[in-house]
Amino acid sequence: MSINDDVICNDSNNPHFQDVLKDAMKDPSRRNILRGGLGLASMFALPMLPGCGGATVTNPVTQLPAGSILGFSAVTKSILDQVAVPSGYTVKVLHATGDRLVSSIPAYSNTGAETDDWSQRFGDHHDGMDIFYVDSNGRYSATATSKAVLAMNHESSADSHLLHPRGQTSGGVNGKKFTQFGDWDVKARPGLEVLKEINLHGISVAEVSLDSTGKPTGYVVDSPLNRRITPQTLADVRGPAAHLAAIRASFVTRFDTTGATSRGTLNNCGHGKTPWGTYFGCEENWAVYFNMPANSTLPDAKIIASRKRYGVSNAVLSSTATVGSGQGWYTPTDMEDTDARFSRWNVAATGATAAQDFRNEPHTFGYNLEVDPLNPNARPVKRTAMGRFAHEAAVCGIPVVGKPLAFYMGCDSRNEYIYKFVTTAVWDPADFGGGIAAGDKYLNEGKLYVAKFNSDGTGQWIELNISNTLISGYTSSTYTGFSFTKQADVLVFTRLAADAVGATKMDRPEWGAVNPANGEVYFALTNNSN
């Protein structure tokens, strides 16, 4: 995403990391650290201990070894439109956008001639991915075997004009191109085009073929392990037992009036891999796909206020509007609206209650979706205890037997925060390969934290809990009508809770990683104006 597409939704007075750094640089010793090449990591490394709670952690500076630590020669600079790899390495396409998972549909034409709905093809904008090896008993293996599947995110439909014979169509006119970011021309779209664009998103799981040395050579069409998880795939809504009923109340729509399930996943960017062998598809820029047509009725003030904080449609389109966000997925009239597959993207209050419309549909996105890549029959799960925001990655600290697990997560938007989820359950290697059941054990119950950095090089993990009076007493002139009344609000409206406790704004926290040698946690911050 370009900086111009990334709308800033955080107008809190919380300090920005740039300001924290500026204050830190007033100390000559810290300026010398930067001049010495150790960079910000030595000054502001994330506290690693999963149980540190609100404790202050100081990060000692360690000297990096002299010389290059890369085990290969870097590629030379190039302006060619091709993938470049270091000497001694090769690159090969395993699968590409539009390739089929099953032989019952035609091979991809690359001309837009496909008449299927794309739910059995690889999506577009390949992003986070991980490989999962399979042992002789069909269970997850942490070491290489002769069989593997590749789980992969498909983030965006910004280039979906290429799926259709003559570009995107609206108002009966073709040859158009709409990103998700405010350039749809507010005219009706054809159903098949919209279905392709919807199903272009999500996650693919595909068995990869391996040569005699274990190197992937391609993928296996018709493998029983192949599947797609799209925005239309049924998912369970799970979370802490004491708050689950209230969380599910925020998921109530005409599709599921109990809120126990939701549909699919959207705009998956970064990913995560659990110690027990499941996959996280992290839902990032999901907020831009919804709209409210002209002359619609607005939902209540609390919903509208929360939408402002998340960048979701919070005002109806004017009758004279010529552009809107999303790609007009709620507009088709030439196909049946089966299971409200189109109307769900209209998030106005069209019914008397939330159970009669889709005003709550945005609440069903913004989570880590857990998928068992080795069990095609296992329903994906929205892990609500890990919070709702623009999830970019969910990286797990080094598991220690008998200790809680810690997952580190970034909210990938300008001025947003870094989070941590610490499990209540302690790690037991017997859960290795335990699938979604293991996920229930570790991910339903735990504590959610947000990071605050100080100019002296220390930092705190602040727990996000309704018992904190900064949260329970939160008010804002910008988000009039919003207040926290229960812990479920904290988990569904996590950004606002982080605002309340004074978390440090960051420059778009994107991918994270854990150093396997010492457990250090790193995040790439990718967007500022400098």
What are these regions (language model features)?
Residues 178-236, 272-347:
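Carboxylate/His-rich catalytic cores and anion/metal-binding grooves
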Residues 125, 267, 364, 390, ...:
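Beta-rich catalytic cores
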